[in-house]
Regions:
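Short acidic-glycine loop/turn motifs at beta-strand connectors
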Residues: 43-46, 239-242, 320-323
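Glycine-rich phosphate/pyrophosphate-binding beta-alpha loops
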Residues: 108-109, 195, 252-255, 332-344
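Phosphate-binding site of ATP-dependent enzymes
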Residues: 199-275, 287, 291, 295, ...
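Active-site nucleotide/adenylate-binding loops and adjacent lid/helix of ATP-dependent enzymes
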Residues: 5-9, 13-28, 93-98, 138-229, ...
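Hydrophobic beta-strand scaffold residues
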Residues: 37, 127-128, 156, 185, ...
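ATP-binding N-terminal substructure of ATP-dependent carboxylate-amine bond-forming enzymes
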Residues: 1-134, 138-140, 144, 162-172
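ATP-dependent carboxylate activation and anion-phosphoryl transfer catalytic cores
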Residues: 3, 8-12, 287-372
Length: 372
């Protein structure tokens, strides 16, 4: 009997569209000899829909029409079994509920990748793929993540955290940044991904604009020292906090001081189909010395374990070209395209990657949780 996998994507997030691409990519690459895959689209109100059109990327050109052709469902637990139950529930004559064995969230950003959705799945009692609630939450909060990694001797850049109350006295905030960090700095919403709301500031005027922009997306903002002569290197990790391996390294190419949301998704969507992060301009493998490559891969595994991660994550690093120092930048606990393009060069095809993410159980996450 095939394992019934609910592949969930979309959701209430600014990275909604990116998640749709990642989710459908995963659906298309599942081993259908082993798995019965149920694509589940979550709207921007987190309503769940299933149906024949849900797994087709071309259907998302008109969401209203897609939803009319599809069935809204809710997740229910009956006697320890989890179902996707048609909603509204009808006592007689309604459509049959679909039983699922495993939930596979392919969601990105706040409200879905930050532990909130993982907590929902845990409450429902459904085994799920990937990081647990704690690791997901820490991985999304850049400030807490830095604090944890600093305690584990992982090199991170100096940073300052500001809240809305600090923003109300912005001149004092600007003074603190100038005194404590100096220019240039990078300003980031504390809990968003895909470079949303992130910008570089090289003077007080730019810093004011950057802070204004970041607070449009979050109630907390991180300001950190910016490396002038920067090189970005990414590496994926597969495993758990006890046993993990690193992928090949990549160097993403971009048009500005930092890799923007447009670099990652928008520019590549024009004429390139639904490739998501797989279509970003990059060098694979990154041009690194054997020693630096192994340093990146070792630090990626160490960071992954320190944060208590499971499944597949992508870790983004920075190299200061002036002194060769390597710094942890951020982790994506559910990376765009599940970072499959970093595993293929080391002999792990996408189908095998998905299989390994689903099928191994951990005694540390309870009877209902799955991870790699």
């Amino acid at each position: 009997m095939k394992t019934r996998v609910a592949m969930l994507f979309g959701g209430k997030s600014v990275e909604h569209e990116v998640s749709v691409i990642s989710g459908i990519q995963a659906v298309m690459n599942m081993d259908t000899d082993k798995y019965a895959v149920i694509p589940v689209y979550m709207t921007k109100r987190n309503e769940m829909y299933i149906g024949e059109e849900i797994g087709k990327i071309e259907s998302y050109k008109n969401i209203d029409e897609l939803l009319k052709k599809s069935q809204r469902v809710i997740m229910t637990n009956e006697d320890g079994k989890v179902f996707l139950t048609p909603f509204p529930v009808k006592m007689f004559g309604g459509k049959k509920a679909v039983e699922i064995d495993v939930a596979f969230p392919v969601v990105h950003g706040t409200n879905v990748e930050d532990g909130a959705f993982q907590g929902y799945l845990k409450t429902m009692g459904i085994p799920f793929v990937g990081c647990d609630v704690t690791a997901s939450a820490i991985g999304m909060d850049k400030y807490i993540m830095k604090a944890v990694l600093k305690e584990c001797d992982v090199p991170v850049l100096d940073a300052q955290l500001y809240t809305l109350s600090d923003y109300a006295q912005i001149e004092i905030l600007l003074d603190k940044v100038e005194k404590g960090l100096g220019y240039p700095v990078i300003v980031k919403p504390v809990n968003l991904g895909s470079s949303v709301g992130i910008s570089v500031a090289k003077n007080r005027v730019e810093l004011t604009h950057s802070v204004d922009d970041a607070f449009k997306y979050a109630t907390k903002v991180l300001v950190e020292h910016a490396i002038t002569n920067l090189r970005e290197i990414n590496c994926s990790v597969l495993g758990d906090e006890n046993d993990a391996i690193a992928s090949e390294c990549e160097e993403p190419l971009h048009t500005k001081d930092i890799l923007s949301y447009e670099d990652k998704y928008v520019s590549n969507a024009k004429g390139s189909g639904s490739k998501g992060m797989a279509s970003v301009s990059r060098k694979i493998p990154a041009e690194l010395s054997p020693e630096k490559r192994e340093e990146v891969r070792e630090l990626a595994v160490r960071s992954f374990k320190a944060l208590g991660c499971n499944g597949v994550s992508r870790i983004d690093f920075m190299i200061d070209e002036d002194n060769g120092k390597l710094y942890f930048n951020e982790i994506n606990t559910i990376p765009g395209s599940l970072a499959f393009y970093l595993w293929e060069p080391v002999g792990v095809p996408y189908k095998e990657l998905l299989d390994r993410m689903i099928f191994e159980e951990s005694p540390h996450r309870g009877e209902t949780d799955l991870y790699l």
